[in-house]
A protein has these predicted regions:
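Intrinsically disordered, low-complexity regulatory segments
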Residues: 1-111
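Acidic, proline/glycine-rich low-complexity IDRs
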Residues: 97-138
């Protein structure tokens, strides 16, 4: 189980280090999505720090807000963004691993990620690492 308190603390610390603030936390409570979001504003940007509910993996993406229950299932993959200053600040928080947009937009190698359910891989057929780690699969 991922400690949500540590995630919240990391988001606040990273936002402060960038001269910004946390707008809100969007915590997943149902089957989907398989990630939580900490939405941060800094400068003229809004981004989401996303935390996989199954692993201690963090990434930075465009914030995602489904507007209806149907959209959750049709929302597609996250759009990961380059934010080197945030990635560097996130990497300082022990207990989490941080992946960059380049990592997540790269091809998915199932052999390198044995903790991801093989049935899900076979059914959903993720093309990128980001699709495999951060998704709306049920």
């Amino acid at each position: 189980m991922i400690e949500l308190r540590a995630f919240r603390q990391a988001c606040h610390a990273v936002a402060r280090s960038a001269g910004g603030s946390v707008i809100e936390f969007r915590l997943a409570t149902g089957v989907t999505p398989n990630f939580h979001q900490g939405v941060i504003t800094y400068g003229d940007r809004h981004v989401a720090v996303v935390l996989s509910r199954d692993t201690a993996m963090l990434a930075v993406s465009e914030p995602r807000t489904p507007t209806s229950p149907d959209e959750v299932h049709e929302s597609g993959p996250l759009t990961f963004v380059d934010a080197p200053e945030l990635v560097a600040a996130l990497a300082e928080h022990s207990g989490f691993s941080v992946l960059t947009a380049a990592d997540l937009d790269g091809p998915f190698d199932a052999g390198a990620w044995p903790e991801i359910d093989r049935a899900d891989i076979n059914y959903w057929k993720p093309r990128t690492l980001g699709e495999a780690l951060f998704n709306y699969w049920d």
